[in-house]
Amino acid sequence: MVRARRGCGCPLNQGACHRHCKSIGRRGGYCAGFLKQTCTCYRN
């Protein structure tokens, strides 16, 4: 997993986080961590 910095849509726009992760070659992403402020990308 890869964590992106803030500003990738979290916590209010999880879709933006997902799109960011796809744009860097990952399979997708979601908002995680404290108050869902961190965009976490996944491969599988």
UniProtKB/Swiss-Prot annotation:
The keyword Disulfide bond applies. SUPFAM superfamilies: Scorpion toxin-like (SSF57095). Its main location: secreted. One of its GO terms (biological process) is defense response to Gram-positive bacterium. Belongs to the invertebrate defensin family. Type 2 subfamily. Transmembrane segments: none annotated. It holds the Pfam family Defensin_2. Keywords: Antibiotic, Antimicrobial, Defensin, Disulfide bond, Immunity, Innate immunity, Secreted. Antibacterial peptide mostly active against Gram-positive bacteria. Disulfide bonds join 10-31, 17-39, 21-41. It is found in: Secreted. One of its GO terms (cellular component) is extracellular region. Gene3D superfamilies: Knottin, scorpion toxin-like. It comes from Ornithodoros coriaceus. This is Defensin.
